């Protein structure tokens, strides 16, 4: 079964996120559990936790259908020790918030070397950052998102994702989220079913489908291999509809959150309905 949704707002309270997801016909959703532009947030109080859990139950969202995202400020591969510690503390806080909310996944961007340390050293720092957080939490999987490779961001090659996983001690609590826009911008072709087969065969060989814990379904304004991160609405960008139809018809993408981060929230309900309709092999554009 496919879990399909979008990254919804938690404005006004975390309990509003499941309601907003249900309003657009979603069977999955992503959210920030705190302001993503701030390092710290007030601790979660029991009422907020209870209200969120009640809302998830009311709208029929299990933890397997929810893919929270951490703060964009965090850099788990930071070359400067003091800044690295700040990021590690913030990431641990994000993991603990998920644990309190009964969530089992936390999606994050791996990190950046900022042109100051070697790529290998940065990847090792990211893995160690994950180990530190996992040692102090229970039940939450750290889900590494592939990047477009913009600037000095790592995680844009499958080999880099595999290297991070290799350095994580508890393999049962590390996973990957593949963003289609990021993959395309990083040079993984998705424009035809044949290209999708090739790209995901490579993913399966290098990373392994056992680590796939979520996806971000985004078309790309950016050009193939450009290493520029610019999302677009489904079918409106340089990837086109075929990739998303192909994903909907492949059982390897069942049972994980498939989350839209496309640029027009006003048509998320339409995009979700279209994705649901593509699950039939008879589906056409």
UniProtKB/Swiss-Prot annotation:
Cofactor mode of binding and number, as noted: Binds 3 Zn(2+) ions.
E.C. designation(s): 3.1.21.2
Residues given in the record as Zn(2+) 3 binding sites: 182, 229, 231
Highest taxon listed in the record's lineage: Bacteria
Reaction catalysis annotation: Endonucleolytic cleavage to 5'-phosphooligonucleotide end-products
Binding site for Zn(2+) 2: 145, 179, 216, 261
Hydrolase found in the keyword field: yes
Entry keyword set: DNA damage, DNA repair, Endonuclease, Hydrolase, Metal-binding, Nuclease, Zinc
Transmembrane segments: none
Biological process according to GO: base-excision repair
Cofactor(s) recorded in Swiss-Prot or TrEMBL: Zn(2+)
GO MF annotation, one: zinc ion binding
InterPro entries: AP_endonuc_2 (IPR001719), AP_endonuc_F2_Zn_BS (IPR018246), Xyl_isomerase-like_sf (IPR036237), Xyl_isomerase-like_TIM-brl (IPR013022)
Residues annotated as binding Zn(2+) 1: 69, 109, 145
Family: Belongs to the AP endonuclease 2 family.
Task performed by this protein: Endonuclease IV plays a role in DNA repair. It cleaves phosphodiester bonds at apurinic or apyrimidinic (AP) sites, generating a 3'-hydroxyl group and a 5'-terminal sugar phosphate.
HAMAP family membership: Nfo (MF_00152)
PANTHER family tied to this protein: APURINIC-APYRIMIDINIC ENDONUCLEASE (PTHR21445:SF0), ENDONUCLEASE IV ENDODEOXYRIBONUCLEASE IV (PTHR21445)
Protein name, per record: Probable endonuclease 4
